[in-house]
Each structure stands twice: as C-alpha cells, then as structure tokens.
Swiss-Prot record:
EC code(s) of this entry: 3.4.21.45
Domain of life, source organism: Eukaryota
Primary gene name: CFI
Cysteines engaged in disulfide bonds, as pairs: 33-255, 43-54, 48-59, 61-93, 67-86, 75-106, 141-181, 154-214, 186-196, 229-247, 259-271, 266-284, 278-293, 327-453, 365-381, 373-444, 467-531, 495-510, 521-550
Signal peptide start and end residues: 1-18
Glycosylation site residues: 70, 103, 173, 177, 464, 494, 536
Protein name (Swiss-Prot/TrEMBL): Complement factor I
Residues of the active site: 380, 429, 525
A Gene Ontology term for the protein's cellular component: membrane
Enzyme class: hydrolase
Keyword Lyase part of the UniProt annotation: no
Residues given in the record as Ca(2+) 2 binding sites: 276, 279, 281, 283, 289-290
Length: 583
C-alpha cells in the first residue's frame, strides 16, 4: 500500500493533475520572496516595457534614441510631437509628468481629461472622460470596468496607489440623460487613460456607468487580514495571487506558490490573468503561458465603433522590433536516452555550447560558449600566468580520437576573473575567457558551436527542475573519461543541509540525484549545468564548481549560480551579446 501511495504521488506531480490545497490564503504567498519587494519594475519577475531596460534586476528608463526607429507619430500633453510611442514613453519615464495624449500629430484644440462626478469627495465618483477628438464628455460603461482600468484612472487623477479595493462608491438615484457610454480597455500599467482603447456603447441608465473610489491614506487601519503592497497600499489578503493587479504595482501577484481561480501560475511564482494565456505575447518569463496553444480559442471581440488607437497593440509591435538574440536552440533535436558519473556518452551536436579548456597536460576543465568570442568557466580552473598557453577546443566528443575535420581550436586573448573570487571558499567561482580573433576578423567563427543563453533572473528555474550536466570528468572509481559525458540531475533547493555554512545560497546552486548516481566529478570543473525552459531554449544555469565524494548520496554537486552574475558578465562582454529580453 505504501508503494501505491508513492506511485500516485509521483504521477500527481509528473502529470500535474493534482491541485495543491492550501489551508489559508496566506499559504499562497511566498514570504521569503515578499521580503524582496518585487513590483512591475522587477525584471527578475516580469518583462520590462519596451521603453525600459533591465539593470541589476530593475527596469529603468531607456534614453529615447535607444528605442526602435519605426513607429507612428504621437502627441504628448505638453503639445510636443514624438516620432514614436516608445520615444514618448521613454521621455515620460525619465521625466514623469508629461503624458501620452493621442496617436498622431498634435493639434491646438487637442485635450484629454478624466474626472469623477457626483461624489462626496474628489477621490470618488462616476468616471467621466473627454477624448481628444470628441466635443463632449462621456461616462465610462460599467461592463468594461475592472481593477485594471480603475487603477489607471486613479493614477491619471494623481492618486499614486491607484484604486481602493475595499470601498465602494454609493450611488443614489441620479437623473443622467445619457444614451451612450464609453467602453474602455487597459492593460493596467498605463499612466493615463488616454493610452487605453475606447469604444462606444449604449447605456440604459446610471446603473450601467463605471464608478471608482481612489485609494487614500485615510483608508481604514490595516488588520491581520490585509496584504501590504510595496507601494504602501493595503488590500484584502483574499485578493493576493488571483491574477488581478489590485496593488497597482503588481506586488500582490509576484510571490505566489499557486494562483486562485482561473488565473495562470507561472513557474517563476507570478500569477497572470487567464486571458493572457495563449494571447500571442509571452508574459511568464519562463514562457509556459504560450506553450500548448494549438486549438486554443480566443475570445471574439464585439464589433463596435473604435474611437482611439490601440496603443497596447503598438506596445506589442515595438517589442517585436527589439533586437533578437539567437542562443540555446540546437540545430538537431536532442534525443533523450536512458538517464560525469553515471552519465552517457554525448553525440556530436548534443551539447553545442560545451567546450574543452586544454593546456599542456590535456583537457583539464570544461567551459561554456556564450556567444561572440566568449567562454564562461570556473575561476579555479585557470591561472592568469598561463593565459596564452590555453586552447579552447569545440565540438569535441572524444579527445583521444578527435575528429580533426570538425574540431575548431581557438587561442585565448585574455582571462577575466571575478574580482571577488575566493579560492578558499569557492565564492564567485566564475571567469570569462576571450578568444583571439583571426587576422582582421571582427568576431570569432565557431561554425558548429551554438551559444547557451545566459539567465538574467534567479526565478527562471526552480528546485526539482531537471537539468543536464556534462564534461570529461572522472567516474566515481576515479577512472579517467576521454569521451564527453552527460547526465540528468535535479536542482536542489538549499545545500546548507549538506554542506553547512560552506554553501552560499545567493552565489551557489546545488544539483544531483538523491542516490548520487549522476554527478559532476573531478575534471568536469568549469563545465555547464544547463536547463531548458518551456520552449526548449537552453540556459547555462550553473558552472561546475565544487563538491565532495562525487557520486555518493547526500553529496550533490555545487555550481556557481550564473543568474547571479548576469550584470557582471554583461559588463565585460557587452549587454547585446547575452540579453534575450529587456534590451
């Protein structure tokens, strides 16, 4: 019976048909993650807007000239025209205050306004707007109103924390002679309602009109049932991890073990609205929201009179114009074989990012090709005094009987050690090798090598994810291996339980099998621990660093956690070489 329970538990997680039940709403939220105060500007959790760039885990403003040149002219509230929407948003990001007004050129009479009517205070009421090319003001339809639109409207009115999720505007019997209202759709992170899409609808009375109460510090004192947003706003704990951006800064949706209702849970711990699933735009940084979308039915939009340009479509178009980096995708399909120590021989093309670092004694360490002329490896593998003696061997699967027609051998121009590398503790055990360029060539040519992608976020992969370690190391009986080996290992959450205070969680990653059957060993150092995302794109998640008793249970391998060094790597090799997103 016990074996049956274990088997069912395995099926539950492997086939993902079991739902996790949490005893309380608080159990949905990851407390350790909350302490990091992630928001919509945390590019470790979400993608930056196309007018932003990711630096040290935060989305910061681009300079206008860094935007794509193609686009349509837009007008800002200061009466200035911009060549593209991206340039206008970039300048607004740098100098908040001047907002988007309309798509197209500026006109003298062009004006957009939003106001609240029939409220007792200036923070509540029925929402009324005047569109740029309309002569009269109109109310917003209730049917289209959600927290997305409410937060944007309040932000537009100067309430920095958006809409109040607890309070409701109390409508009395009103006499409103209006047969039409405006349907509005926002993504939720706009800074003005003018950026949202408006269409015209018919209305039957004031009950069909949208109202809002904007959040103020005069709200009720918080209790234990409240969730505190990073921006200081309090919402009900029940509203966390439901796929709805109640906070306005998205902080209630970024540290979730699971999601409520029909919202979609990203592996990175983010909850997104169900309508973002299979909508043609990747919202999860791990990409799984756009996987398995064959036959996925999209919701047909009702035919109505569209009054404003779709600036969200323009945002998506700008994203499509950003530079694309090719990495982590092999030319041939990887063939999984029965499950380095306990590993299997690699075939040509299995590991096109793997390189061997050779000195006078042979291949002593592995490395990872990350693009251009750059190899990533472990600092403990190298000696600065031997820089010009090292060779980089690519497409090697057997270094006793190498295929000379396929192998490319490159020489090393310089080595960059991490400035805080500690040889005693293996902290910051990471280094870069720049290969020499041939003659007057601007770049290195490695025709059969494919760079592995460099991860920018520590949330791309999670404990228990299956990854691949490879190298020319020794077997557990210390027997030398001459052919490239690979094996599947699982990421392990925290190796302090195995290695005590010698394991530094921020800088190191653990991986192995619980029985020790597959492990990195002596000679594998500097080589890759690679993981694949939902789209089968390969990332170098770790660099083989150290461990004890290789191939033994409870002694998993320890790797340098590459995501922790994204900014260090990009500083030396150039951000365009390794940035897939947020550029």
């Amino acid at each position: 019976m016990k074996l049956l329970h274990v088997f069912l538990l395995f099926l539950c997680f492997h086939l993902s048909f079991c739902k996790v039940t949490y005893t309380s709403q608080e159990d949905l939220v990851e407390k350790k993650c909350l302490a990091k105060k992630h928001t919509h500007l945390s590019c470790n959790k979400v993608f930056c807007q196309p007018w932003q760039i990711c630096i040290e885990g935060t989305c910061i403003c681009k300079l206008p000239y860094q935007c794509p040149k193609n686009g349509t002219t837009v007008c800002a509230t200061n009466g200035r025209s911009f060549p593209t929407y991206c340039q206008q948003k970039s300048l607004e990001c740098l100098r908040p205050g001047t907002k988007f007004l309309n798509n197209g050129t500026c006109t003298a009479e062009g004006k957009f306004s939003v106001s609240l009517k029939h409220g007792n205070t200036d923070s509540e009421g029925i929402v009324e707007v005047k569109l740029v090319d309309q002569d009269k003001t109109m109310f917003i339809c209730k049917s289209s109103w959600s927290m997305r639109e409410a937060n944007v409207a309040c932000l537009d009115l100067g309430f920095q924390q958006g809409a109040d999720t607890q309070r409701r505007f109390k409508l009395s019997n009103l006499s409103i002679n209006s047969t039409e209202c405006l349907h509005v759709h926002c993504r939720g992170l706009e800074t003005s309602l003018a950026e949202c899409t408006f269409t015209k609808r018919r209305t039957m009375g004031y009950q069909d009109l949208a109202d809002v109460v904007c959040y103020t510090q005069k709200a009720d004192s918080p209790t234990n049932d409240f969730f505190q947003c990073v921006n200081g706003k309090y919402i009900s704990q029940m509203k966390a991890c439901d796929g709805i951006n109640d906070c306005g800064d998205q902080s209630d949706e970024l540290c979730c073990k699971a999601c409520q209702g029909k919202s979609f849970h990203c592996k990175s711990g983010v909850c997104i609205p169900s309508q973002y699933r299979c909508n043609g735009e990747v919202d999860c940084i791990t990409g799984e929201d756009e996987v398995g979308c064959e036959g996925f039915a999209s919701v047909a939009q009702e035919e109505t009179e569209i009054l404003t340009a779709d600036m969200d479509a323009e945002r998506r178009r700008i994203k499509s114009l950003l530079p694309k980096l090719s990495c982590g995708v092999k030319n041939r399909r990887h063939i999984r074989r029965k499950r380095i120590v306990g590993g299997k021989r690699a075939q040509l093309g299995d590991l096109p990012w793997q390189v061997g670092i050779k000195d006078a004694s042979g291949i002593t360490c592995g490395g990872i090709y990350i693009g251009g002329c750059w190899i990533l490896t472990a600092a403990h593998c190298l000696r600065a005094s031997k820089t010009h003696h090292y060779q980089i061997w690519t497409t090697v699967v057997d270094w006793i009987h190498p295929d000379r027609k396929r192998i490319v051998i490159e020489y090393v121009d310089r080595i960059i050690f991490h400035e805080n590398y500690n040889a005693g503790t293996y902290q910051n055990d990471i280094a870069l090798m720049e290969m020499k360029k041939d003659g007057n060539k601007k770049d290195c040519e490695l025709p059969r090598s494919i760079p592995a992608c460099v991860p920018w976020s520590p949330y791309l992969f999670q404990p228990n994810d299956t990854c691949i370690v490879s190298g020319w190391g020794r077997e557990k009986d210390n027997e030398k291996v001459f052919s490239l080996q690979w094996g599947e290992v699982k990421l392990i959450s925290n190796c302090s339980k195995f290695y005590g205070n010698r394991f530094y969680e921020k800088e190191m990653e653990c991986a192995g099998t619980y029985d020790g059957s597959i492990d990195a060993c002596k000679g594998d150092s500097g080589g890759p621990l690679v993981c694949m995302d939902a789209n089968n794109v390969t990332y170098v998640w770790g660099v083989v660093s150290w461990g004890e008793n290789c191939g033994k249970p409870e002694f998993p391998g320890v790797y340098t956690k590459v995501a922790n060094y994204f900014d260090w790597i990009s500083y030396h090799v150039g951000r365009p070489f390794i940035s897939q997103y947020n550029v």
